[in-house]
């Protein structure tokens, strides 16, 4: 919506200003409500046996922040103009709060991904497991410190302050920040997937033709053909790469296609929408696969310290067919 000068403001425009504000507030409320429901759905359908990692803590913290944002927008929309502790809150603060959250979300992609990658790498590399209580406390403090650091940067950065003040006089116009971090992160992951598939596309096709589904401990499982000399510890990255690709795309292919579409059409999504729990779990699976591939010589499924993906059972990449002694009612289903 285009901003108008004060001398062009007529009585007719002022009469139409309130319905426009109400419509914009309701639209923002519905968007945040849909995002909150999507976050709750993903947190409910995740695997229950997943270990608590740094990314898990951040996903829950993001869902909590989205819920608090929804509550604040609801209060500001309902009461419209009120005073708390001498501070007057109006519809303008809906836009201000949304912009601050957008900037905060937009700058979180790189720190969260870097910390999660370090967390998974350390879990694979260390010889002794840290106390679960102290590890959870460390995760909690790291998440809190990350949120506070990014929020403090947003509030003290001069360029962001100028951007926030630029639209202070126009409560009907509230531009949202579009994160460049998510753009480059998504582009990088898609390029890595494309190169990995290009390198091992023949193995991927052969693997899909030989892969079968069976009932294992009352659960459906995928089994890949392994050479007889393969055990629990893998040292061949070439053999592991196609299995990681199949497992990853088997779960996240719709999300990969969505990312390709967004980048191809150059769709600009506000940061307060783009940073969500499904996106974080998608990045989480990619990071786990990357850490597995780089540390394939250290992998041992009998070690419970291995990171567990909430949506992908990576064990089907490592367990050889000839070791499966507990297969119940094998199904003659071949995926081609």
Swiss-Prot record:
GO terms for cellular component: plasma membrane; receptor complex. Signal peptide: none annotated. Keywords: Cell membrane, G-protein coupled receptor, Glycoprotein, Membrane, Receptor, Transducer, Transmembrane, Transmembrane helix. Residues 42-56, 117-136, 208-243, 294-336 are cytoplasmic. The chain crosses the membrane at residues 21-41, 57-77, 96-116, 137-157, 187-207, 244-264, 273-293. GO terms for molecular function: G protein-coupled receptor activity. The keyword DNA-binding does not apply. It is a multi-pass membrane protein. Its main location: membrane. The keyword Flavoprotein does not apply. Residues 1-20, 78-95, 158-186, 265-272 are extracellular. It is found in: Cell membrane. Glycans are attached at residue 8. Belongs to the G-protein coupled receptor 1 family. Orphan receptor. This is Probable G-protein coupled receptor 160. The gene is Gpr160.
